Curated annotation (Swiss-Prot):
Name this polypeptide is given: NADH-quinone oxidoreductase subunit K
Gene3D superfamilies associated with the record: 1.10.287.3510
Function recorded in the entry: NDH-1 shuttles electrons from NADH, via FMN and iron-sulfur (Fe-S) centers, to quinones in the respiratory chain. The immediate electron acceptor for the enzyme in this species is believed to be ubiquinone. Couples the redox reaction to proton translocation (for every two electrons transferred, four hydrogen ions are translocated across the cytoplasmic membrane), and thus conserves the redox energy in a proton gradient.
Gene Ontology MF terms in the entry: NADH:ubiquinone reductase (non-electrogenic) activity; quinone binding
Keywords from the UniProt entry: Cell inner membrane, Cell membrane, Membrane, NAD, Quinone, Translocase, Transmembrane, Transmembrane helix, Transport, Ubiquinone
Organism name: Musicola paradisiaca (strain Ech703)
GO term, biological process aspect, one: ATP synthesis coupled electron transport
GO cellular component, one term: NADH dehydrogenase complex
EC id: 7.1.1.-
Reactions performed catalytically: a quinone + NADH + 5 H(+)(in) = a quinol + NAD(+) + 4 H(+)(out)
Transmembrane segments: 4-24, 28-48, 60-80
InterPro entries xref list: NADH_UbQ_OxRdtase_chain4L/K, NUOK/Mnh_C1-like
Origin organism lineage: Bacteria, Pseudomonadati, Pseudomonadota, Gammaproteobacteria, Enterobacterales
Amino acid sequence: MIPLQHGLLLAAILFVLGLTGLVIRRNLLFMLISLEIMINASALAFVVAGSYWGQSDGQVMYILAITLAAAEASIGLALLLQLYRRRQTLNIDTVSEMRG
């Protein structure tokens, strides 16, 4: 069994890597991938904590987080596809220029 500190440290490292990718990257697809990494890191923390205390609540929260991540990914990819068809780019700087 993995110690609680090691599992939570791994989850924290993954979360920080996802947050760094979200802040640094300018491509919307990579930003969506970074967001998925952050969601999976938080789900990993739930599983590690549930395993440590012998509760199945962590696994239930993991299933909920994966369901949320799948819904977010499908909606995000559909929006990115439409955006790419209209603007021919996924660069956040180009997309943020609004007409009005």
